[in-house]
């Protein structure tokens, strides 16, 4: 490589540094304090459990049910009686940005195998929200799901507005393109299908993060669709938008709620920092049920090989590694739920040896098509892992007892 080439690389690195430094400097100057929220929920109310004014179901939190069963076992008491009812098929879809193309492929491949069940419960986090949404409504929406993620570019979802975002303190990108997509796809037919499924006792749950309280919010989408509210469709669109709104990057979504007769304002965003996969049901999980986990991405982050990451990359990698660890921990919790309820656990994740760009926000249609194909093949072939990632005996790494090791060749 000649001197001119080195010079170009030097200029490129300086330009890249300035590109990072200028927004950070602006953030320090004007973006450190966000806009005030008009009439937020008072702090004493945020720590108390809220109940719906019109109860929609006997909701069950999987974590609470698991702990109750394990607590009885630890105390030597008899386990709670097994709930009556037929086994359920529960679908849990994780977040993962562009990796949703993989889960879309897995669902469509599963349909092609003829073994895909009708989901009694579907849950979604982050980009898993729209995937779980369409999966819940059935194979009728497979083509829409595939087309949505196969040809997606980032500008179809978000567009940069860094200066305006930093001045207002709301976000570096606008989510207006995603709003238009949701307006197009969540129409009257979808609302009717949602209400019909809910009337059959099936449930769709989407998670968001309450930005002001840093707590998880779970939304019963079918209950909203069947509520008769004139703004029901708009609420559902806003919930999906909030689920996909990356905190700090995209503005949080505002909701006006009424608590004890008083109107307050909340801000909601992507819940991926609070949970990666979860289970909620409209009753206890009967024995023989199946919990199907679709991971929008790999089980472990890509490794940094052959180079030492810089400061910014190290910070990003640390956050990414934390989210991956949260995902793996959440799958262990779901596995424990299956153990205490005598249910089946199955997981499909993008293989760790898949070669692609590491950023989940870099949308490349060619890469999306490759991920979709891998997912399709795994879904069609029934490539379900029976245990959470990293928990099989062969995957367990013992503590280090020095600096000399032996590795498989």
List PLM regions with ranges.
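Catalytic nucleophile serine of serine hydrolases
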Residues: 125-126
